[in-house]
Amino acid sequence: MLSAPGFHHLHLNSVDPAAAIDFYARQFASTSASSWGGLPALASPNNVLLLFSKVATPPATTPQSAIWHFGWHVTDVRKSLGAYKSRPDVKLLPLYTTDEGGSVPISSDTWPPTGSVLGLTRAEIADARAKGVTPKGGSGFAYLQGPDGAIVEYQGNQPVERMNHVHMWQEQPFCAQLWYRKHLNASLVPGRAPASPRTEENCRVERGPDRTWPALVPEGMFRTPTAAVIFGDVMLTWYMRQDDTLLADTRGQLYDHIAFSVADLDAWVAKLRAEGVTFLREPYALGATRAVMIEGPSREAIELVEMKG
């Protein structure tokens, strides 16, 4: 079996890549301006990149595609929040605590979750209120708005500051997990393996009926089912799409595609072609190397970049 790819980059479209890179480098001190394949980039210390293409008009963020936002580990989330509050060019995104109104800047400033789901339903919030449950404070997750309308999560407290995930929507998260494992040899996230292993016969499920909070939208969000895989130390983590509209093609939007590194592109092309995977672009030159682009289970564009040695 071919070795699992590594996470190489998240490709963003931007009206001003240099300004975007400068913004991110100021918010995450461990990162630095770089370039790769002739394109401007932001380098994270775990050897992954945000890669940028310059576009003439602001990139679209609607209709919703499979890519929702990307996230960073930080060592002290409240220290980061304090720094961001002092910077006029940083817009913090509120986490709404109920559909009645009210918001907090960090998830741990509202009622804590009671299980593996990172939020509470209306009924669970009512129960927490009745029992006098109070926020735990401390570490948690929070969001800021990046250039071009990007949503950026910062999560702590973690040992090292680095890019750590791309949060996505999927038509069927369990089926997506199977797809990434079958076609791209992805690993399950340690500690997050499904309690009951899914197969292609039973991976399709109904979306959970209850919205949960905290959430980036006042009406709350559906957090079940959820699934994830990991490439190197970068997770792809998924919730089911939030409405009845099919997810759009990522290409040309703000979050254009995700990219993985492979050692032998020809071997991967042969494997994926034999498995009936959809190719969006046949092998093409990319900087000093080659790449192909395939389509994921919810129309996300996935680039495979050959990185020999």
What residue ranges belong to the model's regions?
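Short, solvent-exposed cationic patches
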Residues: E171-N185
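Short, solvent-exposed beta-strand edge segments and adjacent coil->beta transition regions
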Residues: P5-H9, S65-H69, E161-H165, Q253-H257
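Extracytoplasmic/secreted envelope proteins and their assembly/folding machinery
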Residues: P17, I21-A25, V77, L81, ...
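Mature N-terminal segment immediately following signal peptide/propeptide cleavage
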Residues: L2-W36
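Conserved beta-strand-loop-alpha-helix junction that forms the acyl-donor binding cleft
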Residues: H11-D16, H167-Q172, S196-P197
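Post-signal peptide N-terminal segment of secreted/secretory-pathway proteins
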Residues: A56-T75, K79-G82
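Helix N-cap motif at beta-to-alpha junctions
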Residues: V15-P17, V74-K79, Q172-P173, V262-D266
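Vicinal oxygen chelate
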Residues: M1, G82-M168, S187-I230, T237-R241, ...
